[in-house]
Amino acid sequence: MRLSLESLEILDAIARRGSFAAAAEEVHRVPSAVTYMVRKLEDDMGVPIFDRSGHRAQLTAAGVELLNEGRHLLRAANELECRIKRIATGWETELAIVVDTIIPVTLLWPLLKQFDALNSGTRVRLLHESLGGSWEALLERRADIAVGAIAQGPSGGGYSTHALGEFRSVFVVAPDHPLANAAEPLSAQVLMQHRAVVVPDSARQMPTYSYNILSGQDILRVPSMADKVAAQVAGLGCGYLPLPWAKPYLDSGALVIKAVSEVRPQSRLCHAWRSQDAGQALKWWVETLTSTDAIQHWLATGDLE
């Protein structure tokens, strides 16, 4: 057998993350090991999977076909492994939880400690996505639960949800940013002249969400909400932040709120999970997440305690 599930997992990670280095981080390997596995796969199969003639390696037609069919095999293998363990014990081999970047993953640490105390043998894997990326991970069965997903879920069903409520976003800049002393409310014409810091939608296949980005505006894209906060505190751009993220920096004076002409409406979040073939681990996490108010408390106050 020239194909292995490990090589298909690496190929999938490269395609989703956009680079060998990012894929290596996801699969917990050094980049050179990922490069070696890809070249070995190409040698074993006798076909090029990546075209390396340009600035960035791109999948060949054969590589695209291998990726698409390989994803079917990965899903089937994962479902088989989980089914076998559920039949034997009722507990999944692994449970994947995707956490939207708007939610500090540290809020899950107390729940993970409770889950560890069960000694179920189920491995927990945490993923980080933004906006539609959380839904995509759920619908592609790369994740079993989505924590803090945007409430406007895609059509098609196959999942259940639990509302987390709304949170407020505020438009903020650093005190030394040019907009800090600009007349309020800030108009779209004024904002157009300044760079926005954004966490882009991480969905690769689904239609993406975009909030409050003006057509033609300069954009600094960062990988997480924590990076967005840091960039705006550093004065590298402007933009909306969820109030829970902004609050400590507003209290310290590291950020200031500016009124804008077009006020952003409050956003709604939810937990979502696959509603079919639920094992004991998924049931435990759903029951625990929907009965605890730690995330709702943070959304309301910004308090991580």
Predicted regions and their residues:
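Short beta-strand-centered segments that line the small-molecule binding cleft or hinge
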Residues: 2, 111-114, 132-168
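Interdomain hinge and pocket-entrance segments immediately C-terminal to HTH DNA-binding domains
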Residues: 55, 85-104, 117-122, 167
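Short helix-boundary/capping micro-motifs
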Residues: 13-30
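Alpha-helical linker/hinge and terminal dimerization helices associated
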Residues: 7-8, 44-45, 66-88, 150, ...
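C-terminal regulatory
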Residues: 157-236, 241-266, 287-305
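A short LG(V/I)-centered, amphipathic sequence patch enriched
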Residues: 42-61
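Residue cluster at the C-terminal edge of the helix-turn-helix DNA-binding motif
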Residues: 17, 26, 40-48, 118
